[in-house]
Amino acid sequence: MIDRVTALARASFGELLKRPILLALPGIALALGAVTGGAIAYAPDDAIVDALRQYEPSLVTRIHGRDGEQYAEWLTQRREVVAYEDIAPVMVNAVVATEDAKFFSHVGIDPLAVVRSLIADIRCGYFCEGFSTITMQIPRNLDRYLGGETWLPKSKTLTRKIREGIYAIQIERHYTKEQIFAIYANQIFMGSKVYGFQSAAKFYFGKSISDVNLPEAALLAGIIQTPNSFRPDLNPERAVRKRNVVLGRMLAEGFISDEEHAVASIAPLVLADEDNADGIGDYFTEEIRKRLITEYGMDGIYRGGLRVNTTLDNRVQTAAEVALDKGIRAVDKAAGWRGATTNLLQEGADLETWVHPAWFDRIEPGNIVKAVVLEVEPERARVRFMDQVAELTPEDIEWTNRTRLHRLVEPGDLIEVKLKELREDGTWRLLLDQEPTLQGSVLVVENHTGEVTAMVGGRTFDQSEFNRATQAVRPTGSIFKPFVYSAAVQRGITPSELFVDQPETFYDASRQPYSPENFNNEYIGITSMAEALTKSRNVPTVMLQQKVGLTNVIDTARSFGLTADFQPYLSLGLGVMDISVWEIVRAYTVFPNQGVLVEPHLVKEVFDRNGRLLEEAERQARKVLSSDEAYVMARILVAGIQRGTGVRAKPLANELGLMLGGKSGTTDDRTNTWYVGFSPNHTVGVWLGHDDNQRIHRYATGASSALPIWIDVMRAAEDGASPAVLPMPNNIELRSVDVFTGLLYSEYCKESVELAYIAGTAPTRTCGPTERSILDLPPYQQTYFVSNGKLDTDGG
């Protein structure tokens, strides 16, 4: 019998058409009987059923922040699996009425539909009418995952139909109707990358499939046959017409009343609001994606339906992205107006009709948009963006330090403008802006847990996916100095150790001279070790490095987790080695963390599609400094914000009621600027620079360019935090000392600072009139009064 069926199936329609239709009917009946009988008698081992049991549909991997809210996803197909009970009955009825009216009564195939279809096909000479049931569509829809043409031929032949029928009957033997419908409902393609009714309901209507109403269910059912043709977001009129066809079928099948049909047929199409929210944490998410690919593979993360719980704090991440963009733009403007890079007239464009793709985005005050210059006069420039025409005046270009518009722009220039405010007459007040060439990165780590709450690897992920927080290594400048000073504290040198800050030449092991210079060539004479770090003095730092020993400094730096190829250069302590933001921030957490280095991490937990825990972050920590040593260093860095290069952050410390500490860094030729600092709860690092290592601008410093960004980010990280200080070990003594001599403070001293000392190492002498008189001498004369790091009032 099977041979006869196969022969019939392989017969061409041309041969069938040569026969009278009545002669063909016995063959049709024979084919129909063969389909049913063959399915029952000859189907090998229910192979389709075994495959279905092993089948795992492609699911969306969802990325959640620490608050549990989803903020990103990875997918090839947007699908959420739901049970039959979670599908609204009206949705079931709409699909059954449209796709398979006898679904709940047939055995997988509809014999009468088969006969009707074959007769129509013979008359047409090709497959002009289908007879698929919902059950028959399952192997077709799953074929991609069940072996391709091993299961069903791609071509539309009678052989394929017979196989579909056999598989359908096998499926019906082992699954209930409800189970079959659920398989179908979770697998069906619904346009775009949307698969399954649940995802379709959320995508088009912003609701669960359990909550759809009659017109919505009918519209979804109408999408099934040709999804992209009837997508309501792309073809609303066609989608509504198709919806009404489905409603007609539901009425004909008795699923709805005449009144329900009439009301639903005129229901307005109401779709979910388009999600205009900008994505956050692109660099953060990409870093996770790269790591998880090595663990679970591409299929695992794009089809596996994982739930990834991350350490990202949505609020802090958003603040970091905004702060970096704002800070970069401010620093970039300080470098001056570079001029427009594109002129549309030179490209042959019509200025009145040219459209920028971003003009279709929602606009509001504060946005920065592209605008076309239409006309220019010395004190006025007319520009167009979207359907708006506005003017720029001299006060709108104030940051350029120019007043004549015609010397800045010309007709056809494509420029950036900031929407300052919408006036009462409906026109916009604009400010001239420019696309920055500067880049930067931000990293925020929770001290005690190592959780990374925010990471920004560049100004715009769409323009550059290179992560400057993890992948870039740059010279650090003075933010490396705390590791030199830590090496000193480890070896018993106290914050009151004295140096004479003046020009000096040092010689390396090969007798090569090295003459470091202070910032702006300023020298102050006698200074304490703490003050040298607080005010970022280069010469005393090299002196301290020589006293500690280059090898010891390198060993200490490596113990902090810094992996640069350190060489014993005399310039080492001034930050000539290339280090990443990730490593520097990780190292700085040691100071507020009682000497413990905690490995930063981005992922807290990963679960599979069934909720089974695949991995969970474990706190990885090791001791780098003793609690006493860490506290001594932390208090010196706190002084850096109270009165040093980070003093701009002092109001923030007062505002938050938190002890803040940190260090700025600026490299030679001002090509890199840094600020890294901490609170009792978080450590934040900021870097700015160009990818091609060109100078930022001639006045750029870490304190002027990176620190303002750091302040904004730290404020967000600590929002809502209770006032706190760093926990002080029992073996620590606090003393108010003179910043220059390191002696106990008195009225004769110039300035005081509160510093920490390990018990038994605090100064016992008080600064008096003699010490004050020494400080009034020129630096070269002060040298005679410093011996072995201490003040000798007898002059040696």
Task: Go through each PLM region and give its residues.
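A penicillin-recognizing enzyme superfamily signal
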Residues: 310, 314-326, 330, 351-354, ...
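Short, well-structured active-site flanking segments
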Residues: 104-114, 195-198, 257-260, 489-508, ...
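Non-catalytic structural connector segments
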Residues: 252, 257-363, 379, 517-521, ...
